[in-house]
Regions:
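ABC transporter nucleotide-binding domains
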Residues: 2-4, 9-206
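Alpha-helix N-cap/helix-start and coil->helix boundary motif
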Residues: 8, 92, 192, 217, ...
Length: 320
């Protein structure tokens, strides 16, 4: 169990990047979903031991990992958003170097383990190819190969599918799903599909604060009967957005197919009831009604006050 309590990070400025984040994460895949600048990478870097928090605690199976970063690295696999590979090395040589650097293997065992890891992420065919010749998806898979070296109990992956084409993304999904079968995998992303496909549970982070923790199914169920869809002329879209909560708008043959969230559960003229999607739920969780408070003056999404959707905190001035 990974337990995070009241994690705060303040950068010089001062800029508060995290404001009291608390989460309990068990075995399997857990998603941290939020927009760019929400604090995801700061959170992940602290958990990975490469950034010190201002305050708060992080324990893994009861062990204080912030107090002993070296112990953390023995059980951690980390794939940051921008992983620094040596472009002139082959994939095989890159993994061999990392395995020896981390003290996982030496000599012939290093070559054998590197080859096994490349096979695991479907890169054996490119073992001798230079990393600079790898596609974005291949580089991500190489990153996962180094992250799982040593069979870590905790794997942290930060924005792993950003920039990948659909084929590479789904190939990466399969690899991550296999990894989560017997260990804790924490995934940060701004892509709703990542969470929908991979994560039994996830948290939504906004402005350095977790606004809700839930599952994809629970998040969709909280909107039952309150999502409606209709066609709107482009010239009328701005007025609709000013009057209603527009969760999605897609231009189709000159008209906008628009989805709205209507808390009254009454369909506006020209709209029909629609099945809620996780994209709808994410929008609602990110834009809570300002008249709902958590008792401390902060607003929370009132729509999240249903069984299975735990409002944590929201609102605050943060940029990371």
């Amino acid at each position: 169990m990974l337990s995070v309590r009241n994690l705060v990070k303040v950068y010089p400025g001062p800029v508060t990047a995290l404001q009291g984040v608390s989460l309990d994460i068990g075995t399997g895949m857990f998603g941290l979903l939020g927009p760019n600048g929400a604090g995801k990478s700061t959170f992940m870097r602290i958990l990975a031991g490469v950034l010190e928090p201002t305050s708060g605690s992080v324990t893994l199976d009861g062990r204080d990992v912030l107090a002993d970063p070296n112990a953390l690295w023995s059980v951690l696999g980390y794939l940051p958003q921008d992983f620094g590979f040596f472009p002139h090395l082959s994939g095989q040589a890159m993994l061999e170097y990392l395995l020896e650097l981390k003290g996982i293997a030496t000599g012939k065992e290093t070559r054998k383990l590197a080859a096994s890891l490349l096979e695991r992420v479907n890169l054996a065919y490119a073992a001798k190819r230079k990393v600079k010749e790898y596609s974005g998806g291949m580089r991500q898979r190489l990153g996962i190969a180094q992250a799982v070296a040593g069979d870590p109990r905790l794997i942290i992956v930060d924005e792993p599918t950003a920039g990948l084409d659909p084929e590479e993304r789904h190939r990466f999904y399969r690899i991550l799903a296999e990894l989560a079968e017997r260990r804790t995998v924490l995934l940060s992303t701004h892509i709703v599909e990542d969470v929908a496909v991979l994560c039994p549970r996830f948290a939504v982070i906004r402005n350095g604060q977790v606004v809700a923790e839930t599952s994809p199914g629970e998040a969709r169920r909280m909107l039952a009967g309150s999502i409606f869809e209709g066609a709107v002329a482009t010239g009328d879209l701005a007025a609709l957005q000013a009057a209603k909560r527009v969760t999605q708008a897609v231009l189709v043959e000159g008209r906008n197919r628009v989805r709205i969230h209507e808390p009254s559960r009454e369909a506006p003229p020209g709209f029909e009831a629609a099945i809620p999607t996780l994209e709808d739920a994410y929008f609602v969780l990110m834009h809570g009604r300002p008249n709902a408070t958590n008792g401390a003056g902060s607003t929370v999404p009132s729509d999240a006050r249903v069984p299975g959707v735990t409002p944590i905190v929201s609102d605050g001035e943060v940029v990371r």
